[in-house]
């Protein structure tokens, strides 16, 4: 039984290597892309670059851990600076433009959305599945976004910003700031 287990372990390592090579090929084969050196890609990452993406640039020293997703739609731009680190389960969803400054760190589960679904309230409430409103996201350099931070469309985050875990960012944040999510509010005493 241990021989079979060793074979399976060996095969799974080969499959993971092939998946990583495929991910790197996707990154570098996009016609409007510029990719720096020393890029590290974790396991089970997904890159969806539409054929008519306007521009994709990823700086040197980019490191992305496991189970991350990056989507860049047609006519969209993604710019990632040098030495950016994304931890496990991060997601970038770019329909217009997202910029991430150099030396920025993402904790686990960080999500960036430069768009939201269009909807109408009358005569009947309806959310559109394939129609979106979008606005660029810009994250400065030397930032740290804690675990499970969500950044919504139209936000600019300055340089040297720390955002605590679990924050939903829907407004601009000036440089040299720290944002925390206060959750000490007691709803009911038992």
PLM feature spans:
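Domain-scale signature associated with acetyltransferase and cell-envelope carbohydrate enzymes
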Residues: 1-113, 134-145, 149, 159, ...
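Conserved coupling/switch loop of ABC ATPases
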Residues: 96, 153, 171
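Proline-centered turn/helix-capping motifs that create local helix->coil transitions or kinks
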Residues: 112-121
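Short glycine/proline- and charge-enriched loop/turn segments
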Residues: 120-130
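Glycine-rich, flexible loop/turn motifs
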Residues: 128, 133, 169, 175
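Short beta-to-alpha loop/turn elements within the nucleotide-binding domains of ABC transporters
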Residues: 155, 167, 173
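Binuclear metal-ion centers of metallo-dependent hydrolases, dominated by the metallo-beta-lactamase
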Residues: 163
């Amino acid at each position: 039984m241990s021989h079979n287990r060793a074979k399976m372990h060996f095969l799974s390592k080969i499959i993971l290597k092939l998946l990583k090579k495929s991910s790197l090929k996707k990154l570098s084969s996009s016609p409007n892309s510029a990719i720096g050196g020393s890029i590290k890609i974790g396991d089970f990452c997904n890159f969806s670059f539409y054929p008519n993406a306007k521009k994709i640039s990823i700086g040197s020293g980019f490191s992305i851990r496991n189970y991350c997703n990056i989507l860049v739609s047609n006519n969209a731009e993604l710019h990632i600076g040098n030495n950016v680190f994304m931890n496990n389960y991060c997601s970038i969803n770019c329909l217009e433009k997202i910029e991430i400054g150099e030396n920025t760190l993402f904790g686990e589960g960080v999500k960036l959305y430069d768009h939201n679904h269009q909807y109408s309230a009358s005569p009947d409430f309806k959310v559109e599945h394939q129609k979106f409103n979008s606005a660029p996201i810009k994250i400065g350099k030397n930032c740290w976004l804690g675990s499970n931070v969500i950044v919504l469309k139209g936000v600019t985050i300055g340089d040297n910003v720390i955002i605590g875990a679990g924050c939903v960012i829907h407004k601009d944040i000036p440089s040299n700031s720290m944002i925390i999510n206060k959750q000490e509010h007691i709803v009911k005493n038992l």
